[in-house]
């Protein structure tokens, strides 16, 4: 796993591209927006270094393109306007490809398959969605978890849907009892709760999602990045990231391994 590092501005061109902090005065070739704190995709480790599956992936993409990469922290819901306005060149944060999003942005091919899930306090006695009647459910603003809860809240009779800007503040409220459950991407939640016995993922919510890098609509950079991702899949680099961050081998039939076409709106 790679931490974000800062190379000197005098570094020779023979070296690989630098991945730099957003606070650096050195201008990067590519500015990448990310909701830092989104484990295990992009977050700060105990040493304060920004690390994660997607950090490693985009750092390698930058190197293959011969471009330096700067990661800037953007709330998830702000990533869409940031990429459309040109403030950032691309966005990551386990962003799900949807037909609705494809109307206004472009995605490279997917590299991870996912579903949603429900996490609760282990002491709550809640065993799944059926136990959330009249309860407060937390979601990330603008996320597919937000969309799912909004579309299905009536069926499960949620008492309230409370929106957060990222996993960390939602987890704080869950532990404190201010929300009763939290709906979000299952890989992030399984990673987060693995060393927190007070929390428990109690139900997988099948949504058939795929994650990718997001660009402004029609940006030629998307095709360049897509080609590099194809190469990295063929070399086994993306599959190796899966083993590094999830401790398990990616199945051959998943988008982590299979080279796929860039998605287009239906």
What do these predicted ranges mean?
Residues 144-162, 201-202, 233-266:
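Ligand-binding clefts/hinges and TM-proximal coupling segments of bilobed small-molecule sensing domains
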Residues 55-64, 126, 130-131, 135-136, ...:
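Extended ligand-binding regions for polar small-molecule ligands
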Residues 20-29:
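Sec/Tat signal peptide C-region and signal peptidase I cleavage site
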Residues 55, 70-81, 124, 161-173, ...:
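Short helix-initiation/N-cap motifs at beta->coil->alpha
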Residues 31-32, 36-39, 50-63, 96, ...:
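Bilobed "Venus flytrap"/periplasmic-binding protein-like clamshell domains
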Residues 35-36, 112-120, 186, 190-230, ...:
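Periplasmic-binding protein-like
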Residues 28-94, 103, 225:
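Extracytoplasmic small-molecule ligand-binding "clamshell" domains
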Residues 78-81, 93-103, 150-151, 173-207:
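A ligand-binding cleft/hinge motif common to bilobed small-molecule-binding domains
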